[in-house]
Amino acid sequence: MTDETVKEPMNAHKVAETERMKVMPALFGMRFAQVEQTVYQLMDRLCSTYQGGQWELYTLSNSSFYMAPRRADKLLIQWDGNGFTGEMSADAAGIVACLFTYSALSFQGCETCGDMYHLLLDYGCFCPKARIGLFQFPDLRVGCRSEVAVHAGL
């Protein structure tokens, strides 16, 4: 491993209740409501038992962002697009829903979402807690950048 592949640890910071209304407009501009609604809709498609609820918002030290349902139990995730069925934490499921959202909206011209996709995928590949859920999805596993995968021991 060279010095170029060694990265500082990435951290997630939960957004304080007093800042929740500001963070998404600051990151996504006029598209913030579209991003938020798409994440909720994708979670509804990913998890048949998901019925809405409170979400936690997280900013990442690499400038990305994700949101995850506020719940302690694991979620049964199913995705017909690749035949995936498996359980993952609410945190990992939220990251998956955000990755799918960012990917879809990037193809609709949202450059910020394209950037967020790659930054969040880097975090997901690096963070052991998230990696457990993400790497169950073959589509996401192959997207990890090589230097992140090397540093994460993949």
Please give the residue ranges for each predicted region.
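Amphipathic, interaction-prone secondary-structure segments
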Residues: 30-74
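Low-complexity intrinsically disordered segments
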Residues: 2-18, 105-154
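Hydrophobic, Leu/Ile/Phe/Ala-enriched alpha-helical segments that form helix-helix packing faces
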Residues: 43-47, 99, 123
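Short, flexible helical or helix-coil boundary motifs
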Residues: 31, 35, 50, 102-106, ...
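Short, charged/polar micro-motifs that form catalytic or ligand-binding hotspots
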Residues: 14, 44-47, 81-88
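Compact, glycine/acidic-enriched structural inserts
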Residues: 78-121
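Terminal domain-start segments
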Residues: 1-46
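Short runs of predominantly hydrophobic/aromatic residues within well-ordered alpha helices
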Residues: 20, 51-54, 92-98
